[in-house]
């Protein structure tokens, strides 16, 4: 099949993104957001199923129902918090869900979810010394860290008994309000763009394929995980026939990185190690041949769904496509142009064949038959005598 760019419904992308951001979904409390994604897929005529652990899977069938497939992986869970302790002053001590700095939590408005499903308590994260008129310069001199902040509850409460009367207890989930904003210049500012912007891009790509009446060359599975931020990610739920996995997640826009907010990113490696040589270069070729603005990058303090998949034993090539995000896990910002480039690349990838459609039909094969695209293909005559590099 010859690949062709598809029409991207940017209004749909924007709407889905804003609606996703409006649904609180810290890791461990993701039922609502998964229901939303399932409803969006159902509206496209794509059925979905849910695993015991909450991951959602769906499928765009290719022309064949056997052999090797591919998978796109995103996650709907976000960083957040949990009530660790009720404090004597009527405030709450927090434990983080996921890895993020208290520096970006100070001043954040939050929702506290009690076991009473009809009651959500609001509050705000504040430093322990929050009053400038009381502490003066000590406000700036206090440390930065979760031990230096607390949640002020928006109810008339001054002690532990008052908190318990509100139904608040240790283990209650605390969601940080995203405060999304789309600017006239196309920037999207919000907490939790990681990875809800990725989910919106993937849903938009699937919509473009369905609207165009295109049958993917290879059966394409979608796996929406709910524990990426706490390290489990795609450790389960992948179809055993999957030969290629592409994770879609936030790319790092910061000094020393090549990612941009207005472009898609191809990660060549992250904190776990390099991604698959052949799959990454195939994605780069697709982007280059079809005018997708794609930059390559390598991340240091980074881990994604595919790391969990590989560690769980997935027999698949893995890659990571991203949308550039400034201030990741903080006051995040990306751009609609970058999301559009990412969505288009996903549309093209869904139309393409596997890197090695015949060889990857099985999890393993004969070394001599491997059609390597690398610069050092296997020598069919066998290993040379003596140390490598010495004639």
Residue ranges and their predicted role:
Residues 1-391:
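N-terminal hydrophobic/helix-forming segments and targeting peptides
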């Amino acid at each position: 099949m010859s690949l062709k760019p598809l029409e991207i419904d940017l209004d749909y992308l924007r709407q889905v993104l804003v609606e996703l951001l409006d649904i609180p979904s810290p890791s461990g409390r993701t039922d609502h957001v998964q229901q939303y994604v399932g409803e969006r897929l159902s509206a496209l005529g794509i059925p979905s199923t849910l695993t015991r652990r909450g991951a959602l899977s769906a499928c765009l069938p290719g022309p064949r129902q056997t052999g090797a497939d591919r998978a796109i992986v995103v996650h709907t869970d976000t960083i957040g918090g949990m009530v660790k302790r009720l404090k004597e002053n009527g405030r709450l001590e927090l434990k983080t869900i996921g890895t993020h700095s208290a520096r970006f939590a100070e001043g954040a408005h939050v929702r506290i979810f009690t076991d009473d499903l009809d009651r959500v308590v609001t509050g705000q994260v504040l430093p322990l010394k929050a009053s400038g008129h009381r502490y003066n310069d000590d406000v700036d001199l206090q440390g930065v860290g979760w031990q230096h902040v607390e949640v002020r509850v928006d109810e008339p409460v001054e002690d532990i008994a008052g908190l318990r009367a509100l139904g608040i207890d240790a283990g209650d989930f605390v969601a940080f309000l995203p405060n999304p904003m789309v600017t006239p210049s196309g920037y999207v500012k919000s907490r939790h763009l990681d990875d809800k912007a990725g989910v919106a891009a993937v849903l938009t790509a699937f919509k473009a394929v369905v609207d165009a009446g295109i049958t993917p060359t290879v059966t394409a599975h979608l796996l929406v995980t709910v524990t990426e931020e706490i390290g489990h990610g795609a450790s389960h739920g992948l179809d055993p026939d999957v030969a290629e996995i592409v994770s879609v997640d936030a790319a790092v826009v910061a000094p020393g990185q090549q990612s941009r907010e207005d472009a898609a990113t191809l990660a060549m490696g992250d904190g776990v190690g390099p991604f698959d040589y052949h799959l990454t270069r195939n994605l780069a070729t697709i982007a280059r041949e079809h005018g997708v603005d794609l930059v390559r990058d390598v991340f240091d303090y980074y881990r994604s769904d595919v790391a969990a998949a590989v560690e769980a034993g997935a027999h698949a090539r893995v890659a990571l496509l991203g949308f550039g995000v400034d201030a990741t896990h903080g006051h995040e910002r990306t751009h609609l142009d970058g999301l559009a480039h990412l969505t288009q690349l996903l549309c093209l990838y869904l139309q393409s064949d596997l890197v090695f459609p015949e060889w990857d039909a099985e999890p393993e094969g004969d070394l001599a038959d491997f059609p390597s695209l690398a610069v050092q293909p296997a020598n069919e005559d066998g290993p040379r005598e003596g140390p490598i590099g010495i004639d």
